[in-house]
Amino acid sequence: MENQDRAMRYARQIARMIQVDTVRRPGADKENFDRLHAVMAELFPRVFEGCRRWEFESSLLFCWPGKTRRALVLMSHQDVVEAPGAWKYPPFSGTIAEGKLWGRGALDVKGNLHDIFQAVEELMEAGYTPEWDVYIAASHEEETGGNTLIVDFLREQGIVPEMLVDEGSSIQPCPVPGFDGHAAMVSVAEKGYIDVKCVARGPGGHASIPGKGTPLPRLGAFMCEVENTDLFPVRLSSASAEMYRRMAALSADEGERAYLTAIAEERPGWQESLGERQKEMLGTTIAFTMAGGSQAANVIPQEAYVICN
């Protein structure tokens, strides 16, 4: 019962953070971030009063002093992405229903942000002093590319972290067949990221005489070809191989154990045996996310583009 009460208290606290709309809208959202900071100061008074604190625009950095000047950085972010489409419960309601907490940011990543602050709050309440300085970095522009203000400050202060802990994977029930329990999927590596603008040019004109080979259809054909072609081979990093080895050791299913071991050891045919989600995790993904053409429905553009993430 005590654990259930505590879980519900945490859920209500996260709900309050979700109820503050922190979608990043340049030049128009500082008031919302200030509201979130006020909620957090109420929820985590020891952190806000007992730690050194810096504010960079709406990004926050705290330092919980330790016994040595070695540094651990716990990273998260306050902003969330837009919430379009139909939602079962309003995205900024923080509704607790059906045994779940609903809302934009519940997973990405106000739950994580809350948990970092809550852990430090409870440790401070218990009188604990960390071995290292613990920095809590909570940015406000992660979803839109981010700034480097916190990094610049740490560099200027000569602070070189011994360890960075960022948002990672989840705790999953039964990650492999034959395993009875939950597994924390700890992320120890991260893929790079790039946005590419792909442009097609051609003769424009009026939609009444469209012609052939105009920019938008060519871009459509290009996107279909990219989507249906394996442009980048799947490679197994040392971290990924170790993950598959450990998952194999956990499985009580002999066939699943052999399958996971074959991947870990890169035996012949291992790449062909991967499912789509595994390929996405291990390989380079390509997603077309934005597009642009003419500004009128009856005008064929001379130039059109798509953004490839």
Q: Where do the model's predicted regions map?
A:
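Predominant activation on well-ordered alpha-helical scaffold segments within soluble catalytic domains
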Residues: 15, 41, 114-117, 121, ...
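A generic structural motif
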Residues: 24, 107, 202-208, 295
